[in-house]
Amino acid sequence: MPFPLFPLEVRFRDMDPSPALEAFAYRWAAKLANVFDRIERCEVVIERPHQHQRRGQPVHVRVSVTVPGAEIVVTDDHAPDGVADDAYVAVRDAFRAARRQLVMHARHDHHADLVPSRA
């Protein structure tokens, strides 16, 4: 399993922990370092609400990425639509959204460095 270069915590709520799903989240988190190399930490919460314990019910994923001066938080509520396992789709979609936000943050951060100081 590829390990990211920053602290990563993957937690499961209201569902059994899945080593395969955790490894899947680790792989996606490791890819974030290719976009922005100053990530301080990342937290992933994967949960299935209490009233939806059966397989095929909605999965909620929250990805929180801490970078200098900001925290990027993305959530994905994925309802099944015939996909083999909606938890994997929700994790993938949340990390894709986090990646897009990191790209925007990196662009903004880069341009901020280019603006001359008025001091």
Where are these regions (language model features)?
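N-terminal, polar/charged subdomain of small-to-medium soluble alpha/beta proteins
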Residues: 1-119
